From Swiss-Prot:
PANTHER family cross-referenced by the UniProt entry: TRANSMEMBRANE 9 SUPERFAMILY MEMBER 2 (PTHR10766:SF111), TRANSMEMBRANE 9 SUPERFAMILY PROTEIN (PTHR10766)
Pfam assignment, any one: EMP70
Protein name per the record: Putative phagocytic receptor 1a
GO molecular function terms listed in the Swiss-Prot or TrEMBL record: transmembrane signaling receptor activity
Keywords tagged on the record: Membrane, Receptor, Signal, Transmembrane, Transmembrane helix
Topological category with respect to the lipid bilayer: Multi-pass membrane protein
Cytoplasmic side: 301-349, 396-413, 467-502, 554-578, 630-641
Function, in words: Involved in adhesion, phagocytosis of hydrophilic particles and intracellular killing of bacteria. Associates with proteins harboring glycine-rich transmembrane domains and ensures their efficient localization to the cell surface.
CC annotations in GO: early phagosome; membrane; plasma membrane
Record-annotated membrane-spanning stretches: 280-300, 350-370, 375-395, 414-434, 446-466, 503-523, 533-553, 579-599, 609-629
Length: 641
């Protein structure tokens, strides 16, 4: 069998694609691990994060922490984990299940010096001042700090004490070097095995007595703890000792739990805010109801009455009525192609692509096929589905372009394939340079960039062309009415129908429909918390679709009645302007985090812009098609001589 170059290239690209797809979907409740008594287990370390900087780092980038004796081994990570800055690695924090409870162990070995110099102490002090939290994993469960909400994962790297007259910068910083680990387990009496159903850490600070000529020979037992139970300060002041003796120690205790293995994630998603979600949904449903009544009045009462009038016998009374109604008077211009038709068709294609990605992801999430245990699975699913939805982008972009009487559909296809992905990739690449300069774990390695580019040009672009090809072969739908050769002049508009004002007014209601849920999403995103209430989010998405469609229909009808036939772009921008409010809110939300660093602000501005751009394409496309079907319906229902 002869294999040509095209088959080899396709096989390579398909392998890259499958490598990122593998594992993002799972069936809840599968693949538990049964621990036997005495079985050795190990904790895996991940990243450290801060809500005040938004710049994650690898755990082993912390100065003074002990690396594993066997060397650092990275877990295989999916695309979403890499983009989110997760770097899961092995550690020497081990345990023998149910047999070593309460025993204090030392991590430091002969190769891991307990002496931390002044320069490294300054780094630790900075991390504690910025309230960095440490993220670990055990049996796929993220660690949570004892006494904290489970939705707020990780444990404190250290803490500060503020004396009177001190600021955060001058406060004493203490390092949490001793960890009290609690493993919750559910026993299976039939085979004397157990499953881990919970993982907590209570971090404390211990100033151990200095051991001279350290050789790592303390054994497993912790050395003597100071009689006054002093805490380990990492704050370095002039005239004081410029180094610290730091031992990393831990102890494990085991607690039986009635929680079943397939319910162990429930505690991470418990929320006291369900009433807020329901209030938001009910409030949005009231808006939808009001808009639905308005649309019904327009279609049933006004339009049907007008259509019956126009299709009746042409009397002088009818002619007078026709002159009073504006939307029929612009029938010769209403299907005139808009300005910049290619740009609008590209926006529509991108909007359909984002809509498809969002809807399919939400369906999988609601059905439970996106695993919370698979870190980065949701982000990977979004990227993969965005790539696969490129075919819809090509099809609908070309379809709209041919409706606009466009001829160069191949050029339109190229713009569709490169515009939205290119903007996102360009912003991401620019931000990544700063993250790489900061040595953050969120900096994407070259290999991942190569994979993204391969997926873009090897899968997404061909799918766009494939969709465009199918669309170009379909006949162009005929307009219900003929377009005049000379454009009709638009009369002066009343103040509230000013294009800029009406567009800005139209975006308020779609934004209002998602406002509350947006707050929870941003809190989850920037506070490194869990967000998994996709049932509420799916309802909000449906409300957003209906709201965007109905507000666009209402505003479009008012525009046509005002004899303004430039409705193509306005139908897209009316609902799409909600993204402006989203961007303003997202940027202002950052002030709540108290961030002042340039890179952190750049991250917020860039990611808020990407999110708002996608939201504009999504809502704008919904508004466009709603108005398009309305206009075709009403003008195909009347007879024009």
């Amino acid at each position: 069998m002869k294999i040509n170059k095209k088959q080899i290239v396709f096989f390579i690209l398909f392998s890259i694609f499958l490598n990122h797809v593998n594992g993002i979907f799972y069936l809840p409740g599968m693949i538990p691990h049964d621990f036997a008594q005495g079985e050795e287990g190990a904790i895996k370390v991940n990243k450290i994060t801060s809500v005040h900087t938004q710049i994650p780092y690898k755990y082993y980038q912390l100065p003074g922490v002990c690396q594993p004796k066997e060397g650092i081994i990275d877990d295989t990570e999916n695309l979403g984990e890499i983009l989110l800055g997760d770097r899961i690695e092995n550690s020497d924090y081990t345990f023998n299940f149910l047999t070593d409870g309460g025993k204090c162990k030392v991590i430091n070995s002969e190769s891991c010096s307990p002496i931390i110099k002044k320069e490294d102490l300054k780094v630790l002090e900075d991390r504690i001042q910025n309230q960095y939290r440490v993220h670990w994993l055990l049996d796929g469960l993220p660690v949570r700090q004892t006494g904290r909400l489970a939705s707020d994962p990780g444990f404190d790297l250290g803490f500060m004490t503020l004396a009177e007259g001190q600021t955060v910068a001058t406060a004493e910083k203490y390092l949490n070097n001793h960890l009290e680990i609690t493993i919750f387990y559910h026993s299976n009496p039939t085979d004397n095995t157990s499953r881990i159903v919970g993982f907590e850490i209570f971090p404390t600070s211990r100033q151990y007595k200095k051991v001279e000529n350290w050789k790592g020979d303390t054994g497993d037992d912790c050395p003597q703890y100071g009689e006054n139970f002093e805490q380990l300060s990492v704050s370095v002041k002039e005239g004081e000792d410029q180094e610290r003796f730091v031992l990393w120690t831990y102890e494990v205790k085991y607690t039986p739990s009635p929680v079943l293995w397939n319910k162990r994630w429930d505690i991470y998603f418990e929320s006291n805010d369900n009433s807020v979600h329901w209030f938001s949904i009910l409030n949005s449903l009231m808006i939808v109801f009001i808009l639905t009544v308005m649309v019904a009045m327009i279609i049933i009462r006004t339009l049907k009455k007008d259509i019956r009038r126009y299709t009746s016998i042409d009397t002088s009374e009818d002619r007078d009525s026709q002159e009073e109604t504006g939307w029929k008077m612009i029938h010769g211009d209403v299907f005139r192609p808009p300005s910049h038709p290619m740009l609008l068709s590209v926006c529509i294609g991108s909007g359909v692509q984002i809509f498809s990605m969002t809807l399919i992801t939400m369906i999988f999430a609601v059905l439970g096929f996106l695993s919370p245990a698979n870190i980065g699975g949701l982000a990977t699913a979004l990227i993969v589905l965005f790539v696969l939805s490129a075919m819809f982008a090509g099809y609908f972009s070309t379809r709209v372009f041919t409706i606009f009487k466009g001829r160069n559909w191949k050029k339109n296809t190229i713009y569709t394939a490169l515009s939205m992905p290119g903007i996102i990739f360009g912003i991401f690449f620019f931000v990544n340079m700063f993250l790489r300069g900061a040595k953050s774990s969120a900096a994407v390695p070259f290999g991942t960039f190569a994979s993204i580019i391969a997926m873009w040009f090897g899968i997404s672009v061909p799918l766009v062309f494939l969709g465009s090809y199918f669309a170009s072969k379909k006949p162009v739908p005929e307009d219900p009415v003929r377009t005049n050769q000379i454009p009709r002049q638009v009369p002066d508009q009343i103040w509230y129908m000013n294009p800029y004002l009406s567009i800005l007014m139209g975006g308020i209601l779609p934004f209002g429909a998602v406002f509350i849920e947006l707050h929870f999403i941003l809190t989850s995103l920037w506070d490194n918390q869990f967000y998994y209430i996709f049932g509420f989010l799916f309802i909000v998405l449906m409300i957003l679709i209906v709201t965007s469609a109905e507000i666009s229909i209402v505003m479009c009808y008012f525009q046509l009645c005002a004899e303004d036939h430039h409705w193509w772009w306005r139908s897209f921008l009316t609902a799409g302007s909600s993204s402006l409010y989203m961007f303003i809110y997202s940027v202002s939300f950052f002030r709540y985090l108290g961030i002042t660093k340039f890179i952190s602000s750049l991250l917020d501005f860039s990611y808020s812009f990407i999110m708002s751009l996608a939201f504009a394409a999504l809502t704008g496309t919904i508004g466009f098609y709603s108005c398009y079907f309305l206009v075709r319906k009403i003008y195909s229902s009347i007879h024009i001589n």
